[in-house]
């Protein structure tokens, strides 16, 4: 069985993420969307919320599983018996970072491969950070995140930013 892992923080999941997930799910027998706990980031959505949003978003894809993980991706890959990391690229700047990570992962575990998938051009500008920025200033995010979860995402972001304003 060919198992791929698409890791990320997904805070929140965007239409760009979903595009990569849908396309990668056609390549692998099983695709695991691995939601990482990143100690270098302070997420708006906690790990359970991100996992749940991704499960809702991908429920139409029978070979996709969503799991949270901490620690090294390589250790998670071994635990899941996966051999391929899937990374989405929007721009050259993404490639530079992801290329370094791919080389590091290869150094840590030579049997692991990384494949890069170019984002659909209509999502090349899109990031979770941009979704949060648009929401923060009252913009519409419905075309930026999967329709199925747009209202939940907006509600959470509105609540978060209202709390931030109160604490100023």
UniProtKB/Swiss-Prot annotation:
Residues binding ATP, per UniProt: 9-10, 17, 88-90, 98, 123-129
Cited SUPFAM superfamilies: Nucleotidylyl transferase (SSF52374)
Domain of life from the UniProt record: Bacteria
Binding residues for substrate: 9, 41, 73, 87
Pfam families per record: CTP_transf_like (PF01467)
Chemical reaction(s) catalysed: (R)-4'-phosphopantetheine + ATP + H(+) = 3'-dephospho-CoA + diphosphate
Subcellular location: Cytoplasm
GO BP terms: coenzyme A biosynthetic process
Keywords: ATP-binding, Coenzyme A biosynthesis, Cytoplasm, Magnesium, Nucleotide-binding, Nucleotidyltransferase, Transferase
Molecular-function GO terms, alphabetical: ATP binding; pantetheine-phosphate adenylyltransferase activity
Designated name of the protein: Phosphopantetheine adenylyltransferase
Annotated organism of origin: Caldicellulosiruptor saccharolyticus (strain ATCC 43494 / DSM 8903 / Tp8T 6331)
């Amino acid at each position: 069985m060919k198992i791929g892992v698409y890791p990320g923080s997904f805070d929140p999941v965007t239409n760009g993420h979903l595009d990569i997930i849908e396309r990668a799910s056609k390549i692998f027998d099983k695709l695991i969307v691995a939601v990482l706990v990143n100690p270098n980031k302070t997420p708006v959505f906690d790990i359970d919320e991100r996992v749940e949003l991704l499960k809702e978003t991908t429920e139409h894809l029978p070979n996709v599983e969503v799991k949270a993980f901490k620690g090294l991706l390589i250790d998670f890959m071994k635990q899941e018996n996966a051999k391929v990391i899937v990374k989405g690229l929007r721009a050259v700047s993404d490639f530079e970072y992801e290329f370094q990570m791919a080389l590091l992962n290869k150094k840590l575990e030579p049997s692991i491969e990384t494949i890069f998938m170019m984002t659909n051009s209509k999502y090349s500008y899109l990031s979770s950070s941009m979704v949060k920025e648009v929401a923060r200033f009252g913009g519409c995010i419905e075309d930026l995140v999967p329709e199925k979860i747009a209202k939940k995402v907006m509600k959470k972001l509105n609540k978060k930013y209202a709390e931030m304003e109160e604490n100023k």
